[in-house]
Amino acid sequence: MSKRTTYCGLVTEAFLGQEITLKGWVNNRRDLGGLIFVDLRDREGIVQVVFNPAFSEEALKIAETVRSEYVVEVQGTVTKRDPETVNPKIKTGQVEVQVTNIKVINKSETPPFSINEENVNVDENIRLKYRYLDLRRQELAQTFKMRHQITRSIRQYLDDEGFFDIETPVLTKSTPEGARDYLVPSRVHDGEFYALPQSPQLFKQLLMISGFDKYYQIVKCFRDEDLRADRQPEFTQVDIEMSFVDQEDVMQMGEEMLKKVVKEVKGVEINGAFPRMTYKEAMRRYGSDKPDTRFEMELIDVSQLGRDMDFKVFKDTVENDGEIKAIVAKGAAEQYTRKDMDALTEFVNIYGAKGLAWVKVVEDGLTGPIGRFFEAENVETLLTLTGAEAGDLVMFVADKPNVVAQSLGALRVKLAKELGLIDETKLNFLWVTDWPLLEYDEDAKRYVAAHHPFTSPKEADIAKLGTAPEEAEANAYDIVLNGYELGGGSIRIHDGELQEKMFEVLGFTKEQAQEQFGFLLDAFKYGAPPHGGIALGLDRLVMLLTNRTNLRDTIAFPKTASATCLLTNAPGEVSDKQLEELSLRIRH
């Protein structure tokens, strides 16, 4: 077997006149009677190879037998294509290879779906079952090439900045808070379990206490939670921690790293600092803690109408400490029928809204179901507050503030997609800062950490832990890209007494805190430096930089929405002997 000269997708005019050897898969084959054209494919792309009896009758005979997905080796001379056959759609479209020798390395059965890039309308379950075939598609091959480039760029940046790549345990201790753990039973210790890490949070803090100063890891994390299009049970995290830093230091580092990645893999220069917005401002203006700022349509407080109008829904809402907010779809009045508005009402119902009020602005006033409740002065108030003009569609939700934010925030994004308002070429990064430290869980009747229990409160708010915990703000920051939470970080608690106080506010007894986190509390006794960090979702970053819409397309062997692997049929049953060794019994 000859050595490969280069990849198929890299054969350009630089190789003209050269004898080369290529190896790859038959993408397709065209028999023109006396001449056979084969598109040969590998991870770098496709090149056309030609079987002409003038060059080799024997090679032509073998080419007559090859079919799609055969693995072949060809040798031949690179020549320029005739002008009328040039293919500008591919990098190799100016050239072709006149084959003098071909060897069939391996045959292939007919695949369950075409690998050809033009034929991608295949049920995703079939694609996942035969993932090794799906990954041959050029679109996915390029996605994973970019994933490699992104991780390489991240590693180079962090290495240049003096970070150490340090691995942390995969088998660790199950701790409360956050999502459910994946548990691993111990054979050696009867009835005891390890947990797969949801993140290396505690270990990276311990590494700071160990004196390593700058740590990073591109690490697998595991969360047993309900899946969405942008969630997987196992995912990859760019985990970073630094000592002797404040919030500005961490944010600046994260920003510089992301700018470098975007420039190197997308060729896009991001000038200036990323915009910043407080959590409260994001919720007020966009109804989301991860707002998509590629389009406007902000939420507008029109609670004044509830005080001025004789409309019971609005009036009752304001009297019961609720609020009324509106969004304006510019020029969309004629695009949405009453039936469409009924569908939008059902949509906001999902988020707890009791209804969706709406009006259409016309030259002489308002039309729509609640238009008759607007007196002339109410119309003027509405137009002044919202800036709405003739032809605009104005939608209202009147409810508790959190319901208003969630429902209108989601509706805003839905409308933007339907109306084509989103510029898909934009990369809008945004920092969201000044997060609440705690949230109150109505079901559990206790406070829970908004991020995690190790996030430090703002220094001015430490006293509030004992008096008004819900008012305390955190030294926390999230990085958002195009409406997706790309990552989050915080300055950590590094004082044992403050950490114990935090556990107390979260409802832990001293005994429970010691049992679950005693190793961390003990470490704080031996000189813990101030430290903080950030964790970025690598899969999600790849998804956004490759313009994919599904996280599964960025993971080589992903799980389905029901957390199964269709390729290997995992999870699966195990033998009685294995269960016995683990002292386990399955109860159905």
From Swiss-Prot:
It catalyses: tRNA(Asp) + L-aspartate + ATP = L-aspartyl-tRNA(Asp) + AMP + diphosphate. It is an enzyme of class 6 (ligase). InterPro entries: Aa-tRNA-synt_II, aa-tRNA-synth_II, aa-tRNA-synth_II/BPL/LPL, Asp-tRNA-ligase_1, Asp-tRNA-ligase_1_N, Asp/Asn-tRNA-synth_IIb, AspRS_core, GAD-like_sf. Its EC number is 6.1.1.12. It holds the Pfam family GAD. It is found in: Cytoplasm. Residues 201-204 are annotated as: Aspartate. ATP binds at R223, D224, E225, Q232, E485, G537, L538, D539, R540. Keywords: Aminoacyl-tRNA synthetase, ATP-binding, Cytoplasm, Ligase, Nucleotide-binding, Protein biosynthesis. It comes from the Bacteria. GO terms for molecular function: aspartate-tRNA ligase activity; ATP binding; catalytic activity, acting on a protein; nucleic acid binding; transferase activity. One of its GO terms (cellular component) is cytoplasm. L-aspartate binds at E177, R223, H451, R492. One of its GO terms (biological process) is aspartyl-tRNA aminoacylation. Catalyzes the attachment of L-aspartate to tRNA(Asp) in a two-step reaction: L-aspartate is first activated by ATP to form Asp-AMP and then transferred to the acceptor end of tRNA(Asp). Belongs to the class-II aminoacyl-tRNA synthetase family. Type 1 subfamily. Homodimer. This is Aspartate--tRNA ligase. It comes from Staphylococcus aureus (strain MRSA252). The gene is aspS.
